[in-house]
A protein has these predicted regions:
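Bacterial N-terminal signal peptides
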Residues: 5-16
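Thiol-based oxidoreductase modules, predominantly thioredoxin-like and allied folds used
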Residues: 64-90
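Loop/turn elements at helix/coil->beta-strand transitions in domains of secreted/extracellular proteins
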Residues: 33-36, 67-70, 103-104, 112
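Non-catalytic, surface beta->alpha helical segment in thiol-disulfide oxidoreductase systems
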Residues: 98, 102-125
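Typically the conserved alpha-helix immediately C-terminal to a functionally engaged Cys/Sec
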Residues: 49-64
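A short beta-strand-turn-helix
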Residues: 20-35
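Solvent-exposed loop/turn segments at secondary-structure junctions
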Residues: 43-47, 76-81, 114-116, 124
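Short active-site neighborhood of thiol/selenol oxidoreductases, capturing the structured segment around
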Residues: 31-45
């Protein structure tokens, strides 16, 4: 393998490592000045996997939004416990319903306080 090929291979590996970095936990009550992008998902959603792999992972890997946006997921495959923005207990399903995250994938754009910043985006663009 020549040096150019080796360099490209190393670059791809480093981008893949960054892209595969985990999402932040949905700790909505934790104060932070960054807005949230929340993907409403469920385990059997192939379009969720596509959205994550083709759009969200590259956005996180770019580092361009690191100081502006927190990315997370809310799984509505089961009503799992979740701490809401005000510190109260809710479930993932109740949380998603409140923000009109009825189907998967749905992207929610929320302020650090839980206010809606833009209408939900349904499906894969």
């Amino acid at each position: 393998m020549n040096w150019i090929g080796l360099s490209l291979f190393a670059a791809v590996l480093s981008v893949e490592a960054l892209a595969a970095s985990p999402l932040e936990d949905p700790e909505f009550a934790t104060r932070d000045s960054r807005n949230w992008v929340v993907m409403v998902t469920q385990p059997t959603c192939s379009f969720c996997t596509r959205l994550e792999n083709e759009i969200l992972q590259p956005l996180r890997a770019s580092g361009q939004f690191e100081h502006q946006v927190r990315f997370t997921t809310v799984d509505i495959g089961a009503a799992s416990p979740l701490v809401d923005f005000d510190g109260s207990s809710t479930t993932t399903i109740q949380f998603a319903d409140r923000y009109q995250g009825f189907g998967t994938p749905t992207l929610l754009f929320l302020s650090p306080e839980g206010d809606v910043l833009a209408p939900p985006k349904f499906g894969v663009p």
